[in-house]
Swiss-Prot record:
Record field: compositional bias (Polar residues): 42-55
Location of region: Disordered: 1-129
Keyword Phosphoprotein on entry: yes
Residues the record lists as Phosphoserine modifications: 64, 67, 87, 107
InterPro entries for this protein: BTB/POZ_dom, Kelch-typ_b-propeller, Kelch/BTB_domain_protein, Kelch_1, SKP1/BTB/POZ_sf
A Pfam cross-reference name: BTB
Kelch repeats (start-end): 311-359, 360-412, 413-455, 458-500
Gene3D superfamilies linked to this entry: Kelch-type beta propeller, Potassium Channel Kv1.1, Chain A
Record's keyword terms, sorted: Kelch repeat, Phosphoprotein, Repeat
Protein name, per record: Kelch repeat and BTB domain-containing protein 11
Biased composition (Low complexity): 12-31, 79-91
Gene: KBTBD11
Amino acid sequence: MEHAVAPCVLYPGTEPGAAGESESEGAASPAQTPCSLGASLCFSSGEESPPQSLASAAEGAATSPPSSGGPRVVERQWEAGSAGAASPEELASPEERACPEEPAAPSPEPRVWLEDPASPEEPGEPAPVPPGFGAVYGEPDLVLEVSGRRLRAHKAVLAARSDYFRARASRDVLRVQGVSLTALRLLLADAYSGRMAGVRPDNVAEVVAGARRLQLPGAAQRATDAVGPQLSLANCYEVLSAAKRQRLNELRDAAYCFMSDHYLEVLREPAVFGRLSGAERDLLLRRRLRAGRAHLLAAALGPAGERAGSRPQSPSGDADARGDAAVYCFHAAAGEWRELTRLPEGAPARGCGLCVLYNYLFVAGGVAPAGPDGRARPSDQVFCYNPATDSWSAVRPLRQARSQLRLLALDGHLYAVGGECLLSVERYDPRADRWAPVAPLPRGAFAVAHEATTCHGEIYVSGGSLFYRLLKYDPRRDEWQECPCSSSRERSADMVALDGFIYRFDLSGSRGEAQAAGPSGVSVSRYHCLAKQWSPCVAPLRLPGGPTGLQPFRCAALDGAIYCVSRAGTWRFQPAREGEAGGDAGQGGGFEALGAPLDVRGVLIPFALSLPEKPPRGEQGAP
């Protein structure tokens, strides 16, 4: 009977030409010479034990150590062949092909290591296991195979955090596909510690994708939160692109949130803004404008009495102006003003103009501090405040230094109108970061004091010695036009646009009239921008809770109402809608006192700005 040939297990002979091997070679049958190698290196194995001569030779080889000149090249292969009955997971790694008859060699790695190298040449890495886990869970009882490497973990830890591992809790060896080795290491560290460390913009996409594949939603959110502070103009678009390719909504929204929070920087960067689609650009701006909740704010600028008549040549009050140069936020629930931020160093606090564009507060021009000659001069500096990051930054300076200017926002541009003894007007394009001249004010318009607002895509400026002239600027034609003037000759406090109307607030009584001659009051008239017609809105009345004397104030529109702010108090004016009965005087509106006065020095300029809410705001979804 011919015996089946077993695979050869070859060793270099200590003496290739040793006596006895040649004699046994001649006595062997053809079935006993199964391979083409020299007969002195082969033996056959049947169902019974091999012939005595071969057994003696094998016993001699086992008892005598191999010579130093010949390394061991082949082991007993029949033991390795028994691995064919193992599962595919056990065959995936060379370490699983251990002989069942031989005890497994103890691992040379410390117990705190999670990773078994696939080959002895590759070193292992320390495990991200917090102290005390070994005592609680014992030795790792799960082997994770990924990218040819093996990681050890505890089934109980992973099953408690993931349905994916809970459904596979019966397996001792688990091959993980679709997740990179780097991502799996970070996810395991997060599963043990609850902290996502080591996430960077260049690997966050694979970490979030791995967390979704392994059903670790908490890890995906922590990875997104961890990479948020690392986003910048240099990497935000790459992160967004990776998130869109892999449909990672959390990461995509984080990139959109960064871009909307830093909208001006993104707008000026062609490598980012130029690669966004039109829908994405609209989404960023929409998120920016709807972020948080709109609040009433007021900037304290310049000392008291320094409104429209302070000349740049006078250096008095510079130090005092800097002391109260801050922005305050009105908290309606508490009825009080609280400081939000202070003007940055280098921003003049007297005679500057301010407005809001893209939910940024811009401050431009003003009276610069006195120079070496002791004379103050107009400033050309421009700064902007970002409420999303609570930070100030410098913007391209004006082409011409200005004080007592009016700064307005219209159709995504800034307009610096006039100034003391100036008729010129310039426009700022935030995307190009450039100021450019536009049509100047008509000659003989007004030298210093004027009010300005925007309505229906046009700029309206009122001024003159008696504040009765009204001019309109059409940006499409780049020209100024004369509008019907108001019949009022009272001292104007401010002018603000709301719902297609321009509301003008006048302090009753002429400039030279004594305050004791009669009660002080405020009259309101409005101009219909389409009908081009003035009409009275509120007859002169005293502000509720206000002082007996006239107090100049400034106005801002917010949530369908107009807020009047001065150092004496804060009032809300609610115009009557069409067809409604009037307010205090029966002519269409009334005043309501709000909170306590703001105890600061200087002129208060109110405006509306959206401040971030907690938790982080943002419009979910994508175009």
